[in-house]
């Protein structure tokens, strides 16, 4: 048994500069996939005061009005007022998109297996890059996610909803939340120790109003009352003022919130970001597949928690390795789990794309509030439709 300990995770709102960039990149990806499901897309975005830069590599038959997609995305987030130092109607938008490198394309279009004479059509697509990707699930929340990141996302979704429906009129789009959970000797969540929430606001609202409103209408409205006690600390706008925010306050860049996007630091991360990438990029698709595996393993009762690692070589279809770690909670051996995974999940890029139906415009909705454990949207890698097949292996 371990001693009681604290664990902290954070989330950020859709108006955070890095998340604006993620959403623009994924909105462009979606617009291309809507016209051309085979599009190869790797789009990065940078945002700063009054300026958006879109750059990367694309191979597609689609025609997309990038300027319109960028401006519509910014306005939908809530940047519609020039007083914010950044708004969708008046910012400059610069675009520099090249074609995908033919050196990369030849390995993705025709994998090593295909070039070696393998006739299986699902061997056709080689991995778009080398790397390792992780998926994780744990049974401490209904969505099988770690509690600290799940609660942090809930806070951010709530404050965005209150801003967008006009309930709290002085809110502006940029915000961050951080939740510290105390775990007991058996590694079970015991209580919430600290909540940090910083939100951008209009200049004419006082700090006491901000703090009391956020505690009452956001924090206590969202967090489980049985985990809050008189020792829980609430730190709301602890700098005292947060008027300048969004891209005016900090430059933003696609792919800088990879821990917010995943498990809040509870599990390993391979380093690759998701947004702006089509599903031939295993940074994205294999991370989704690894979560799909992990969630089904835990939902099947085969472990209380599991971390799955997949690794790929560029231009090769089959993963070079599969590893699992149940942290001692497995009801079967890790080796047996790996065999069951190989039997029930096709982890070649084309197999993942087919299994999870990934050549669709479904990505913009993932670019804020996390890619995993989402209860507000339907994502194929969150389905638990492999539970019966996994259980059958161990009957």
From Swiss-Prot:
It is an enzyme of class 2 (transferase). It is found in: Cytoplasm. Its EC number is 2.5.1.6. Pathway: Amino-acid biosynthesis; S-adenosyl-L-methionine biosynthesis; S-adenosyl-L-methionine from L-methionine: step 1/1. The keyword GTP-binding does not apply. Its main location: cytoplasm. Keywords: ATP-binding, Cytoplasm, Magnesium, Metal-binding, Nucleotide-binding, One-carbon metabolism, Potassium, Transferase. Mg(2+) binds at residue 18. Its cofactor is Mg(2+); K(+). It holds the Pfam family S-AdoMet_synt_C. The keyword Methyltransferase does not apply. One of its GO terms (biological process) is S-adenosylmethionine biosynthetic process. Binds 2 divalent ions per subunit. L-methionine binds at residues 57, 100, 250, 281. K(+) binds at residue 44. Gene3D superfamilies: 3.30.300.10. ATP binds at residues 16, 174-176, 241-242, 250, 256-257, 273, 277. GO terms for molecular function: ATP binding; magnesium ion binding; methionine adenosyltransferase activity. It catalyses: L-methionine + ATP + H2O = S-adenosyl-L-methionine + phosphate + diphosphate. Catalyzes the formation of S-adenosylmethionine (AdoMet) from methionine and ATP. The overall synthetic reaction is composed of two sequential steps, AdoMet formation and the subsequent tripolyphosphate hydrolysis which occurs prior to release of AdoMet from the enzyme. Homotetramer; dimer of dimers. PANTHER family: S-ADENOSYLMETHIONINE SYNTHETASE. Belongs to the AdoMet synthase family. This is S-adenosylmethionine synthase. It comes from Lactiplantibacillus plantarum (strain ATCC BAA-793 / NCIMB 8826 / WCFS1). The lineage of its organism: Bacteria, Bacillati, Bacillota, Bacilli, Lactobacillales.
């Amino acid at each position: 048994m371990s001693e009681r300990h604290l664990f902290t995770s954070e989330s950020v709102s859709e108006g955070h500069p890095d998340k604006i960039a993620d959403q623009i990149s994924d909105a462009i990806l979606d617009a291309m996939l809507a016209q051309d499901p085979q599009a190869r897309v790797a789009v990065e975005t940078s945002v700063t005061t009054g300026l958006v830069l879109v750059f990367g590599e694309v191979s597609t038959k689609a025609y997309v009005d990038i300027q319109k997609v960028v401006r519509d995305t910014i306005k939908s987030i809530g940047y519609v007022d020039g007083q914010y130092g950044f708004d969708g109607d008046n910012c400059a938008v610069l675009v520099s998109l090249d074609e995908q490198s033919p050196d990369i394309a030849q390995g993705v279009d025709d994998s090593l297996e295909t070039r070696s004479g393998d006739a299986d059509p699902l061997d056709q697509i080689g991995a778009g890059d080398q790397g390792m990707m992780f998926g994780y699930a744990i049974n401490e929340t209904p969505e099988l996610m770690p509690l600290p990141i799940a609660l942090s996302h809930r806070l951010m979704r709530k404050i965005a909803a209150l801003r967008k429906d006009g309930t709290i009129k002085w809110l502006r789009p940029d915000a961050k939340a951080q939740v510290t959970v105390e775990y007991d000797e058996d590694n079970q969540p015991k209580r919430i120790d600290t909540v940090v929430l910083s939100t951008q606001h209009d200049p004419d609202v006082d700090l006491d109003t901000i703090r009391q409103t956020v505690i009452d209408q956001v924090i206590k409205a969202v967090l489980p009352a049985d985990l809050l006690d008189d020792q829980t600390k609430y730190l709301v706008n602890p700098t005292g003022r947060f008027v300048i925010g969004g891209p005016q306050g900090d430059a933003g860049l696609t792919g800088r919130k990879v821990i917010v996007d995943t498990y809040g630091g509870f599990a390993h991360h391979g380093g690759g970001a998701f947004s702006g990438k089509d599903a031939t990029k295993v940074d994205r698709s294999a991370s989704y597949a690894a979560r799909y595996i992990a969630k089904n393993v835990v939902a099947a009762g085969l472990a209380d928690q599991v971390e799955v690692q997949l690794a790929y070589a560029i231009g090769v279809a089959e993963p070079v390795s599969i590893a699992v770690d149940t942290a001692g909670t497995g009801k079967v051996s890790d080796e047996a789990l790996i065999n069951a995974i190989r039997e029930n999940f096709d982890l070649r890029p084309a197999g993942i794309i087919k299994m999870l139906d990934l050549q669709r415009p479904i990505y913009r909705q993932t670019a804020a509030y996390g890619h995993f454990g989402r209860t507000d949207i339907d994502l194929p890698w969150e389905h638990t439709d492999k539970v019966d097949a996994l259980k059958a292996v161990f009957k």
